[in-house]
Design a protein with these regions (language model features):
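Structured, active/binding-site neighborhoods that engage oxygen-rich ligands
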Residues: 1-180
Length: 180
């Protein structure tokens, strides 16, 4: 239920993404008679397609190629990563170079796909979350994605929240801001 409400909020809030302010809204701002693009959900669907077609061959380069082929998002870190890749800058550098949003939240909010694809295998979830996040993020943006993918993957079998947090922390640098 919470996830569904979050997705609805993401869809209905999309016209205001990247804009700060208080809005006086009394109706939907877009046509909702059919599904509207949502870059975060769209990326997860593209990753599922990559898993289906590429299997274990998935790495950052493969994901960047799929991103470039299927995703139109040009905002923020998404656009920077894509533009860098189009200029021949390979992951993980395409997520780092000229990217003022490299530490942003775009990668961790889509990391659940790797947790579900690698249910109960946090190490594999961490690997794929790294491959994914390094296309458009670096540093804290990557650590957050890995941390979330790991704890969500482990949560399929571990229910103790404190243990899950410790498991997640074991996959990222001790001195990163996610841990501190």
């Amino acid at each position: 239920m919470v996830q569904m409400i979050g997705r609805m909020g993401g869809t209905l809030g999309a016209p205001f993404e990247c804009f700060r302010g208080v809005y006086d809204i009394d109706w939907f701002q877009q046509d909702i008679s059919h599904p509207v693009p949502n870059d975060d959900v769209d990326l997860q669907l593209v990753w599922l397609r990559a898993i289906e077609l590429e299997g274990a061959k998935i790495d950052s380069h493969v994901l960047a190629e799929y991103w470039n082929t299927y995703i139109c998002a040009t905002l923020s870190e998404y656009g920077t990563g894509k533009n860098n890749f189009n200029m021949g800058i390979e992951p993980p550098l395409c997520g780092r170079m000229r990217n003022p949003n490299k530490d942003s939240n775009g990668a961790w909010i889509r990391s659940e796909i790797w947790a579900c694809a690698c249910a109960g295998n946090p190490q594999l979830a961490a690997t794929y979350a790294y491959f994914d996040s390094s296309v458009d993020h670096a540093d804290e943006g990557v650590y957050a994605a890995v941390f979330c993918a790991v704890i969500e993957s482990a949560a399929f079998f571990e229910k103790d929240i404190r243990k899950l947090i410790e498991i997640g922390k074991s996959y990222i640098p001790e001195d990163c801001k996610i841990v501190c």
